[in-house]
């Protein structure tokens, strides 16, 4: 039986404090959501294996603090990223207006080799709030901004309801992999003493 290649991808999630970065990560990795808000201190990360076609990807997803006092830590966390996810709250205009600042800061601190083609994905989160009545950022406005930045993929999500989360992270995985060098390092399958293999995959569609 041929070995499936396991590719490690580093994904950074950026955005203002309170837009739902931690909730999106926990919904995708653990299928859990908490109404209790707790600000991320510095940065934290979770990992999850995603299978797309014949490849198994290990996503290392970094959730970073949105507070300004932690932004100086960025250079240590951003370096080596394969994709950057920009998150805003569709009910808070300021969080959308700040997307450009987060994008520019990432490019400066991460210093990717090809900044013009580095993959970003934008998520407009919290679409569930008040059944959409509190929304202030239209989908049209968000897509126009993404188009102006090189046609960045855009998804509207609800971490609370799990809406579009899997589809967004499948797109994130594919874009991160495109940023990998052709001869990317890979992790071989691990086989336990009973001869079984442990695999996890998502059933998301892009």
Curated annotation (Swiss-Prot):
Family annotation (PANTHER family): RAB FAMILY, RAS-RELATED PROTEIN RABG3C-RELATED
Keywords: Cell membrane, GTP-binding, Lipoprotein, Membrane, Methylation, Nucleotide-binding, Prenylation, Protein transport, Transport
Superkingdom, taxonomy of origin: Eukaryota
Entry keyword Lipoprotein: yes
Cellular compartments annotated: Cell membrane
Residues where lipid is bound covalently (S-geranylgeranyl cysteine): 204, 206
Main localization, broad class: membrane
Name recorded for this polypeptide: Ras-related protein RABG3d
Keyword Nucleus: no
InterPro entries documented for this protein: P-loop_NTPase, Small_GTP-bd, Small_GTPase
Residues engaged in binding GTP: 15-22, 63-67, 125-128, 158-159
Bilayer topology annotation: Lipid-anchor
One Gene Ontology cellular component: nucleus
């Amino acid at each position: 039986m041929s070995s499936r290649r396991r590719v490690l991808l580093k994904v950074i999630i950026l955005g203002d404090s309170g837009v739902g970065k931690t909730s999106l990560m926990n919904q995708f990795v653990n299928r859990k959501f908490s109404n209790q808000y707790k600000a991320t201190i510095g940065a934290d990360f979770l990992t999850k294996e995603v299978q797309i076609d014949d490849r198994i990807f290990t996503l290392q997803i970094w959730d970073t603090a949105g507070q300004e006092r932690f932004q100086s830590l960025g250079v240590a966390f951003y370096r080596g990223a394969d994709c950057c996810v920009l998150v805003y709250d569709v009910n808070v205009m300021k969080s959308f207006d700040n997307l450009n600042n987060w994008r520019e800061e990432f490019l400066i601190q991460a210093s990717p080799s090809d900044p013009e083609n580095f993959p970003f994905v934008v998520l407009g989160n919290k679409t569930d709030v008040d059944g959409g009545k509190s929304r202030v950022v239209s989908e049209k406005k968000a897509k126009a901004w993404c188009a102006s930045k090189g046609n960045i993929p855009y998804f509207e999500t609800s971490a609370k309801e799990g809406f579009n989360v899997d589809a967004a992270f499948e797109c994130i995985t594919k874009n991160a992999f495109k940023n990998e060098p052709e001869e990317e390092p890979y992790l071989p399958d691990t086989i336990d003493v009973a001869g079984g293999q442990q695999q996890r995959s998502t059933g998301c569609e892009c």
